[in-house]
């Protein structure tokens, strides 16, 4: 499994990358591998509030549907509209083309409360 060291991780299998005053998030390589081929990614609405640890949306695969949780609290400022036509980007490149949404966090310091890649991998 690939879990880049420059990212932070939630126990619920989401990753976070800081980009200026925003955070980009998606599901981890482990999560996409467990789900199998994704067929649908439901993204949150731009402008909606998300709360850390709570369900933000759902991904559906040929095997099952799974909740996506918000890794930090904040406002959704952008979603990856490419996933509407190509949800398999999450399987092919979960940390690149497969990002799901961007959040303007209520407190950027909350990212530091998330797991390192070593801590995340130890919990798998």
UniProtKB/Swiss-Prot annotation:
Keyword tRNA-binding in annotation: no
UniProt name for this protein: Glycine cleavage system H protein
Domain Lipoyl-binding: 22-104
GO cellular component: a single term: glycine cleavage complex
NCBIfam families reported for this sequence: gcvH, PRK01202.1
Gene3D superfamilies per the UniProt record, alphabetical: 2.40.50.100
Quaternary state and interactors: The glycine cleavage system is composed of four proteins: P, T, L and H.
One GO BP: glycine decarboxylation via glycine cleavage system
One Pfam assignment: GCV_H
InterPro entries in UniProt: 2-oxoA_DH_lipoyl-BS, Biotin_lipoyl, GCV_H, GCV_H/Fam206, GCV_H_sub, Single_hybrid_motif
Family, as annotated: Belongs to the GcvH family.
SUPFAM superfamilies: Single hybrid motif (SSF51230)
Highest taxon above the source species: Bacteria
Alphabetic keyword roster: Lipoyl
Gene: gcvH
Modified residues (N6-lipoyllysine): 63
Role description: The glycine cleavage system catalyzes the degradation of glycine. The H protein shuttles the methylamine group of glycine from the P protein to the T protein.
Cofactor note text: Binds 1 lipoyl cofactor covalently.
